[in-house]
Amino acid sequence: MIEIKNLTKFYGKGESCFKALDDVSVCINDGEFVVILGASGSGKSTFLNVISGLETIDGGSVVYDSEQLENMSEKELTIFRRDNTAYIFQQYYLLPHLTVEKNIKMGADLDNNKDFFPLIEAVGLSEKRKKFPSELSGGEQQRVAIARALAKNPKVLFLDEPTGALDENTGRLVLDYIIKLQEKQRFTMIMVTHNANIAETADRVIKMNSGKIVGITENTDKKTVYEIGW
């Protein structure tokens, strides 16, 4: 379980100080798929970055089971993120000198004996697995980043608009694969999106505005990506 209590985040100093997160509290259960909705500037991406340990906590706490992020040293936090989490953000951060296949293997804790072909095939890159990032389109590079994160078999997967660079059909296929994998492996998945339709596939939906949680909805009738359309 991830327990978030009275979480606060500031940007800037003095008169330019801005409260991006304002006393946010929520618990996220193990194996749960949570979608975070909100307009631009609502604090949803900041919330994701802080609870994932990518940004510092200015007030409150984030507790994974019994481990508090705010009490960890930089080294401890790096090890914790490496061993427990994976990220799919809008930036790709691919290694330009490695092929598609090797970039994906980089996410798997050096377990290079594992068969990654089913994963590569699922994101539609089987014919380009020997290509380099410079030979791929932006959407194809995003699919490599998605596969690399999934190759880690994370306990918690964080996603920030993961299919934003993909065309509608490819985005639907990739997202459907991610959701089905989450349901099978039961890792915790927390996704920021502007797409209210995608929220219908989640266990819970958190709505944010002005750095605060303004609503939490449970989905009693979860749908698949193919059922909802985009």
Predicted features along the sequence, with ranges:
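ABC family nucleotide-binding domain
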Residues: 2-202, 207-208
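Conserved beta-strand-loop-alpha-helix hinge in the C-terminal portion
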Residues: 212-230
